[in-house]
């Protein structure tokens, strides 16, 4: 049985999980966020978004000062009390955004793959794609260790593109709406394990972990959690885990923040 009184970390995806996929509303999750905050349970945001976007959202959600995982694990924003850790305030894994952009531009020029990156357009275009304000859309372009893109070619070409990236030490990852290119060594799972170990080192005891996500790129995160909530999502691929023991994995009937609330209700209130 889970209790918010025990040493606990909650890791959560954003779009389609804690935030509504279309309106970005999070109010259905607000009561649980308040309850966790009052119990001093860290809610660690974990997303494909940039750290600039996530810091803005973190403050909006009342979670400022906590660590977060940005760009699918390629960037870790450290907790404000971790100032003695090398790299503070952020740890960046592997190849930089600029280097990845150079690789993609070369592949597009020489092998004629068809895609559009966030670097190819302005904030007004991204605002149209996402429904964000222009000021928020501008934050989506502040990548440090990944590139976000829209794929505009065939499935066959995608397989070729993925293979070429793998040869170059990169990975091609599907998110809720867009595709992401990042260092092959980076991942939400590695970033989460690093944060868990840091909390364990501080307290002397490994905290119990609960993760929530809705897309294929959340699977690595949910695999390393003690308990997992798979929020009903829009992605046709869904989320599939190696261990879907119903005592540790709950699939919600509701989407977005209502599903987020349902998952917390299942593992806490209903047990």
From Swiss-Prot:
Protein name in the entry: Mannosyl-3-phosphoglycerate phosphatase
Record keywords, A-Z: Cytoplasm, Hydrolase, Magnesium, Metal-binding
NCBIfam families, per the entry: HAD-SF-IIB (TIGR01484), HAD-SF-IIB-MPGP (TIGR01486), MPGP_rel (TIGR02463), PRK03669.1 (NF002976)
Gene3D superfamilies listed in its UniProt record: HAD superfamily/HAD-like (3.40.50.1000), Putative mannosyl-3-phosphoglycerate phosphatase, domain 2 (3.30.980.20)
Family: Belongs to the HAD-like hydrolase superfamily. MPGP family.
Top EC class for this record: hydrolase
Reaction(s) this enzyme catalyzes, per UniProt: 2-O-(alpha-D-mannosyl)-3-phosphoglycerate + H2O = (2R)-2-O-(alpha-D-mannosyl)-glycerate + phosphate
GO molecular function terms attached to this record: magnesium ion binding; mannosyl-3-phosphoglycerate phosphatase activity
Cellular-component GO terms for this entry: cytosol
Keyword Iron: no
SUPFAM superfamilies linked: HAD-like
């Amino acid at each position: 049985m889970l209790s918010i009184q025990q040493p606990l970390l909650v890791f959560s995806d954003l779009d389609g999980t804690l935030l509504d996929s279309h309106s970005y509303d999070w109010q259905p999750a607000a009561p649980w966020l308040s309850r966790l905050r009052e119990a001093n349970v860290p809610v660690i945001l974990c997303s494909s978004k940039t750290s600039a976007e996530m810091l803005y959202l973190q403050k909006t959600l009342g979670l400022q000062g906590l660590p977060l995982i940005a760009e699918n694990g390629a960037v870790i924003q450290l907790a404000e009390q971790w100032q003695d850790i090398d790299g503070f305030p952020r740890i960046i894994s592997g190849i930089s955004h600029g280097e990845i952009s150079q690789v993609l531009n070369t592949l597009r020029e020489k092998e004629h793959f068809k895609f559009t990156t966030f670097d190819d357009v302005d904030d007004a275009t991204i605002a149209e794609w996402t429904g964000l304000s222009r000021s928020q859309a501008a934050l989506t372009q502040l990548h440090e260790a990944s590139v976000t893109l829209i794929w505009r070619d065939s499935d066959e070409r995608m397989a070729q593109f993925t293979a070429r990236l793998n040869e170059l030490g990169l990975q091609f990852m599907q998110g809720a709406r867009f595709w992401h290119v990042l260092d092959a060594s980076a991942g939400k799972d590695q970033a989460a394990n690093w944060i868990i170990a840091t909390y364990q080192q501080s307290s002397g005891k490994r905290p119990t972990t609960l993760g929530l996500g809705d897309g294929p790129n959340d699977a690595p995160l949910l695999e390393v959690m003690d308990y997992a909530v798979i929020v009903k999502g829009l992605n046709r691929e869904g989320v599939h885990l190696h261990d879907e023991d119903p005592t540790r994995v709950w699939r919600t009937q509701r989407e977005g923040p209502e599903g987020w609330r349902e998952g917390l209700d299942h593992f806490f209130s209903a047990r």
